[in-house]
């Protein structure tokens, strides 16, 4: 194989390489054996056409495209490796010569990884706005949240207040004409929940069971039903019941109802304090890691970030998100339907942060390279087993999905992140 690379501009160039006749001839033979099985040529049994007759009738060139399709991927990969390139986007391939009896010549316009000039990335001073201490208020807030989850709705005689639930019938109309979807019976509506369009729930506050209220509202300009958007409507609303939330007493019995592993309210508070402390510690560590990496990226200089890398990052992020949905048993089409979004919306969402993520990835990779980080066979095996456990997969499945090089890359990246983070100090 002959390989050459010519720089055209920063992070771009043309890779020229050949596929030798030593590789071409056996591949042409393989393609011919496959093709002749389906050939019907008068005077010959199907699948028994001699090669010289094929070449005479169809020309050896008829086999070239299939042979090229088979040979090109490995030839390109070998050429990239021999040229010592780190290609970061799909190449633009052009077959420049496929002469009979000659080596085939291919050119590939490639985008290469930009140079990263590292600044300080160890022993950084960072600031984080995360509180590690667990306060009594934190514990009480969590208990109160669980207490409210156990609350019951009881009928009240007094007028409805925000936070109450009303059971209502309603009939909506615009200019005296009822519209589709504007009617409901025995509907439970939490006042202040924001379930209905703005202004609806507020107009029921202060009214009691048995009353009928004319609720006048205006549909938002961006309302999903375009025929209703921006229009004023009247909802004749009858209140059947007003219910208030009744929370259980704050005592040992409540504690046992919340968590069967505790006996007293004091036990529950202590358990929650430990859990909150662990969660806050994790949040604090994440904040330090993020701040340290951001600082390392700010200290580095990246020589002209290729636009193609940003596109690749968006594509990777979208695929990762959709893959996670499917692993959770969620159909992507159903997700888009429920959220009222499209794949283009998802693409645009990741586009906004792709440049920052790409720069971060480049700097971390540069740190791993500068430190000479590698991954042992033992570390790779441990990583495979951890991924299998995390995603409830068989070890063999993970090994089939991820190459050793991919796993090694992930491990060295983790080591670089750990180095940046562990040597950082918080101001």
UniProtKB/Swiss-Prot annotation:
Location of the protein in the cell: Cytoplasm
Function as written in the Swiss-Prot or TrEMBL entry: Involved in protein export. Acts as a chaperone by maintaining the newly synthesized protein in an open conformation. Functions as a peptidyl-prolyl cis-trans isomerase.
UniProtKB keywords: Cell cycle, Cell division, Chaperone, Cytoplasm, Isomerase, Rotamase
NCBIfam families per the UniProt record, alphabetical: tig
Gene Ontology molecular functions: peptidyl-prolyl cis-trans isomerase activity; protein folding chaperone; ribosome binding
A Gene Ontology term for the protein's cellular component: cytoplasm
Species this chain originates from: Streptococcus pneumoniae serotype 2 (strain D39 / NCTC 7466)
Assigned EC number: 5.2.1.8
Entry note about domains: Consists of 3 domains; the N-terminus binds the ribosome, the middle domain has PPIase activity, while the C-terminus has intrinsic chaperone activity on its own.
Family to which the UniProt record says this protein belongs: Belongs to the FKBP-type PPIase family. Tig subfamily.
Protein name: Trigger factor
């Amino acid at each position: 194989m002959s390989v050459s690379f010519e720089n055209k501009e920063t992070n771009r160039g043309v890779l020229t390489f050949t596929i030798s006749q030593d590789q071409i001839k056996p591949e042409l033979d393989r393609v011919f054996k496959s093709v002749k099985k389906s050939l019907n040529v008068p005077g010959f049994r199907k699948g028994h056409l001699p090669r010289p007759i094929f070449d005479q009738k169809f020309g050896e060139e008829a086999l070239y495209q299939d042979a090229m399709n088979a040979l090109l991927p490995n030839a390109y990969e070998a050429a990239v490796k021999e040229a010592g390139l780190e290609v970061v986007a799909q190449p633009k391939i052009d077959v420049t010569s496929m002469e009979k009896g000659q080596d085939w010549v291919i050119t590939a316009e490639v985008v290469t990884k930009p140079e990263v000039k590292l600044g300080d990335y160890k022993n950084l001073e960072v600031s984080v706005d995360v509180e590690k201490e667990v306060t009594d208020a934190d514990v009480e807030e969590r208990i109160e949240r669980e207490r409210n989850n156990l609350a019951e709705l009881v009928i009240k005689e007094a007028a409805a207040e925000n936070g109450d639930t009303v059971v209502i019938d309603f009939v909506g109309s615009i200019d005296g004409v009822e519209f589709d979807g504007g009617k409901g019976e025995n509907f439970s509506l939490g006042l202040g929940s924001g379930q209905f369009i703005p202004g609806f729930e507020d107009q029921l506050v202060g009214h009691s069971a048995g009353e009928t209220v004319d609720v006048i509202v205006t549909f938002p300009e961006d309302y999903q039903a375009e025929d209703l958007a921006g229009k004023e409507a009247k909802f004749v609303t009858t209140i059947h019941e007003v219910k208030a939330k009744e929370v259980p007493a704050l005592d040992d019995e409540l504690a046992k109802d919340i968590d069967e592993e505790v006996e007293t309210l004091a036990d529950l508070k202590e358990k929650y304090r430990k859990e909150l402390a662990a969660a806050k510690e994790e949040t604090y560590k994440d904040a330090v890691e993020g701040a340290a990496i951001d600082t390392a990226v700010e200290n580095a200089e990246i020589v002209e970030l290729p636009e193609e890398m940003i596109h690749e990052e968006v594509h990777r992020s979208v695929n990762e998100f959709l893959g996670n949905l499917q692993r959770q048993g969620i159909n992507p089409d159903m997700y888009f339907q429920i959220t009222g979004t499209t794949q283009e919306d998802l693409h645009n969402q990741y586009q906004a942060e792709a440049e920052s993520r790409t720069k971060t990835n480049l700097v971390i990779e540069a740190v791993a390279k500068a430190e000479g980080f590698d991954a042992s066979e033992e570390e790779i095996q441990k990583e495979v087993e951890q991924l299998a456990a995390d995603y409830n997969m068989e070890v063999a499945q993970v090994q089939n999905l991820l190459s050793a090089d991919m796993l090694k890359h992930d491990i060295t990246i983790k080591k670089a992140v750990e180095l940046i983070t562990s040597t950082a100090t918080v101001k």
